[in-house]
């Protein structure tokens, strides 16, 4: 009797497995479905207008537009592609992985000199501060002699580092320029006392000031406006792309208007989510105005070109 029950149980088990196998997709079918889904997503992504952004405050209008649904998704698929370093943003733009980005004038002028077509959409409110480690006892730029200064190559921070060194006639060979591309890593190295000085933009500069690190120079004092939003001319020349940029422009303007009306701290939760800010840093952020309708000034283009041609 026990043997008969056992035989019935095994038979039912085999039937169940057979039914499940017949109903469920085979491994090969699952692979084909997965490949088809990946292809679908790739096609959607390739058709979308992709904008490179970093965890810096010049990108805040884009983050707000995305979070608040200010980009008209019925008319255009606009996607933000997140990076930790501007050098990676520039490379993605060069390789056609993104159509536009929030970046700086030095990087885009360098791309243009390499024959890459650049269309300037907007200037941004980005600025950079040269900050020294309070434990390094560097109180002024002259004391950077034999010190390590973190920056990133072929960029506004690199230009400003040279401006600082030249302003006090330091021997460049005696200031050690260290390439740290990741903006958050650069800040952590200052807070961990691994660097003597560095160029920082917001909100990283605010965090540095909160920890009593000293500001030696501010790019605004030099009269330079180096932050830009730029698009690849190659990736945006057809009518569909132009329509997407029009939709992007409307969303960007609406986000700037909201930020200017309400102030950035009104969007505290977004700032905490995107920039990983604690309350102390959030409350210490400076008031900022976000403009639109401006393209780079010729004097700033000339400054970038002159530095690149050195």
Regions found by a protein language model. Give the residues of each.
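Bacterial N-terminal signal peptides that target proteins for export
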Residues: 2-10
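Proline/Glycine/Serine-rich low-complexity intrinsically disordered segments
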Residues: 135-142, 165-167, 173-175, 187, ...
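Pocket-lining segment of extracytoplasmic ligand-binding domains
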Residues: 105-107, 177-271
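Short, glycine-/small- and polar/acidic-enriched structural segments
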Residues: 26-171, 177-178, 189, 196-202, ...
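Secondary-structure end/capping motifs
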Residues: 238-310
């Amino acid at each position: 009797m026990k043997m008969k029950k056992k035989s019935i149980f095994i038979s039912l088990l085999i039937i169940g497995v057979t039914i499940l196998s017949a109903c469920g997709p085979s491994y090969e079918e699952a692979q084909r479905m997965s490949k088809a889904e990946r292809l679908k997503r790739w096609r959607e992504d390739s058709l979308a207008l992709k904008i490179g952004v970093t965890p810096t405050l010049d990108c805040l209008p884009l983050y707000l537009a995305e979070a608040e649904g200010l980009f008209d998704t019925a008319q255009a698929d606009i996607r933000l592609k997140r990076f930790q370093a501007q050098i990676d943003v520039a490379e993605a733009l060069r390789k056609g992985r993104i159509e536009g980005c929030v970046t700086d004038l030095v990087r885009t002028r360098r791309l243009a000199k390499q024959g890459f077509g650049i269309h300037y959409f907007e200037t941004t409110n980005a600025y950079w501060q040269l900050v020294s480690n309070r434990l390094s006892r560097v109180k002024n730029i002259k004391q950077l002699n034999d010190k390590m200064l973190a920056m990133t190559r072929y960029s506004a921070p690199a230009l400003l580092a040279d401006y600082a060194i030249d302003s006090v006639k330091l021997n460049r060979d005696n200031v050690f320029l260290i390439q740290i591309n990741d903006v958050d890593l650069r800040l952590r190295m200052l807070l961990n006392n691994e660097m003597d000085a560095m160029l920082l933009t917001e909100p990283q500069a605010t965090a540095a000031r909160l920890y009593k690190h000293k500001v030696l120079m501010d790019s605004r004092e030099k009269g330079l406006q180096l932050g830009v939003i730029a698009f690849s001319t190659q990736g945006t020349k057809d009518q569909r792309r132009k329509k997407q940029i029009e939709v992007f422009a409307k969303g960007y303007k609406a986000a700037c208007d909201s930020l200017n009306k309400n102030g950035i701290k009104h969007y505290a939760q977004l700032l905490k989510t995107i920039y990983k800010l604690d309350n102390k840093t959030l409350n210490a952020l400076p008031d900022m105005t976000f403009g639109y309708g401006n393209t780079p000034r010729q004097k700033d283009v000339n400054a970038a070109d002159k530095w690149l041609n050195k």
